[in-house]
Amino acid sequence: MGGLMKKNTLILGIESSCDETAASVVKNGNEIISSVVASQIESHKRFGGVVPEIASRHHVEQITLVIEEALKQANVTMDDLDGVAVTEGPGLVGALLIGVNAAKTLAFMHNLPLVGVHHIAGHIYANRFETEFKFPLLSLVVSGGHTELVLMKADNEFEIIGETRDDAAGEAYDKVARTLGLAYPGGVQIDKLAKDGEDTFHFPRAMMDEGSFDFSFSGLKSSFINTLHNLRQRGEEPNPNDMAASFQASVVDVLVSKTIRAAKQYDVKQLLLAGGVAANQGLRERLIQEVKLELPETELIIPPLALCGDNAAMIAAAGTVSFLQGKRSGFDMNANPGLLLEDI
C-alpha cells in the first residue's frame, strides 16, 4: 500500500450500525489519530438487548458531538481530510441511516470523497493497526450478528468459506446469559464466570467433524437451556461458573478447531481474529495456544480490546483501502442492512 501514497491520507470514519455511535480520524489506514465511541449499553441493559428505536434516538443525539470530538482530538478540520468513510451495512436500518446521512452531508458540504464500508470488512481491517497484511490470510469473525471464516487473497477481496447456519456465537452467548439471569451484554459475563468454572456439563460440539467450515450454535443453546430447566425442575441450582465454562468450552472448541483446519487447508500466512467476541479471553487464549501447536509458521493477529467492539477507526482503516483503490460511493448511497461482504 505504501507505494500508492503520495502523502499522508487522512480519513474520517463514522460507525452507527448498532448501539455505538463512533467517529475516528485515521492516517494512512494504520495509525489512529483519534477515536471516540459513545456507548449505549446502559440504555439497553434493562431490556436485555438492543432496542432499535432507542438505538436510533441515541445516534441522533450523539452523532454530531462524536464527530466534532474526533476532529478536535485529532486537531484537524474537515478541510484537512481526504475523505469520509462510513458503515453502509449490515446493521439496524434506523441506526445505519444516522451515520450514512451524517457522512453524506459532511462529504457534500466539504466536497470530499465518500466511501461506504461493510461493517465486517471494518472488523477485519481493525487488525491493520497491528501489522501489515500478508496474503493469503484467514479471518475468524465472531460477533453478535456474525460468525464467519473469511479468506482474503488480496486487499478488499473477501471469500466466506464458512459461516453460521443459525445463531451467531455472540447471539448464543447473550441468550444463554439471559437464562442465567446475567446482565446485558451477556458475553462478557459468561467469559468472567467461565474463568472460575470447569467443563462439567460437556455440551454438544455441533458439526465438529463435518468436512464443511460452517458453524451451528442453536443446538448448543437449546441443550444449555434444557439442562438448566431440568435441574431447576428438580430443585437444583447449578453452579453458574461451571455452566458458563461448559458453554464457553463448547463454543471455543468448535470455533478454534474449524479455524485451524481451514488455515491449514488454505495454507494462509496470517490468521486474524475479528469482531466483538474477539475480546473473549477464553477464545483468545485458546487460539494463541492452538496456533503455537498446530500452525507455528502462521502469524496470529489479535486486535487490542478497544478495537474488538464496534468503533470507527476500523471503518476508517477499511475505508482507506477502498479510497486508495479509487472506490467511491455516490450521494445516493443508502443504509443497506442486508449488505453482503462478497458484494463490496
Swiss-Prot record:
Chemical reaction(s) catalysed: L-threonylcarbamoyladenylate + adenosine(37) in tRNA = N(6)-L-threonylcarbamoyladenosine(37) in tRNA + AMP + H(+)
One GO MF term: N(6)-L-threonylcarbamoyladenine synthase activity
Residues that coordinate or bind substrate: V141, V142, S143, G144, G145, D174, G187, D191, N280
Subcellular location field: Cytoplasm
EC number: 2.3.1.234
UniProt xrefs under PROSITE patterns: GLYCOPROTEASE
Cofactor: record remark: Binds 1 Fe(2+) ion per subunit.
Residues binding Fe cation, per UniProt: H119, H123, D310
Pfam families linked to this entry: TsaD
InterPro entries in the cross-refs: ATPase_NBD (IPR043129), Gcp-like_dom (IPR000905), KAE1/TsaD (IPR017861), Peptidase_M22_CS (IPR017860), TsaD (IPR022450)
Keywords: Acyltransferase, Cytoplasm, Iron, Metal-binding, Transferase, tRNA processing
Named cofactor requirement(s): Fe(2+)
One of the GO BP terms on file: tRNA threonylcarbamoyladenosine modification
Any single GO CC term annotated in Swiss-Prot or TrEMBL for this entry: cytoplasm
NCBIfam families registered for this protein in UniProt: gcp_kae1, T6A_TsaD_YgjD
Family: Belongs to the KAE1 / TsaD family.
Role according to the record: Required for the formation of a threonylcarbamoyl group on adenosine at position 37 (t(6)A37) in tRNAs that read codons beginning with adenine. Is involved in the transfer of the threonylcarbamoyl moiety of threonylcarbamoyl-AMP (TC-AMP) to the N6 group of A37, together with TsaE and TsaB. TsaD likely plays a direct catalytic role in this reaction.
This protein's name: tRNA N6-adenosine threonylcarbamoyltransferase
